[in-house]
Amino acid sequence: MNEQVLIKALVEHAYLEGDFVLRSGRRSRYYLDKYRFETVPELLGALGERLAIAVAEHEPEVARLAAPELGAVALAAAASLASQLPFLIVRKEAKGYGTSNRLEGVSESGELVCLIEDVVTSGGAALQAVETVREAGLVCRTAICVVDREEGGSDELARHGVRLWPLFRASDLLGQVKSVVNPHG
């Protein structure tokens, strides 16, 4: 799936207009519903391939991927299959039973990990995942997301030593929305 076709598919499946409160607490007139694109096999497969390519380009020495639950796990699994890199699931909090781990999967201290994210707004969820990964003795200096909403998340991650590489920016998708609504400019 080429870039323009993928952008169009993301807009068609995930772009919603209305009055939304985002995880960051901010209000928005639009919402990118990650579950609407992560649950479509054709889109998930195409995104997994693009994420794997981006990981190889921006963090070629990486040992494994990591993804915050729940939203980015399907993306990390798709990228893992495409890249053959193992991945970790980063829990928001330790479960109260079993291993009580915040990181699910196997890793060794000192390994280089690349964070996979879905939609980044303020960077809060990504930063929490990076902190969890680092507390486990792993190195994380790169995050790759499907969409950067361009609302400060990249800068916030940079302040903590993490470079964000988006597959797409909100402006890419919003430009597609405008062309669908008014195709003649």
Pin down the residues of each PLM region:
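PRPP-associated nucleotide enzymes
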Residues: 1-116, 120-185
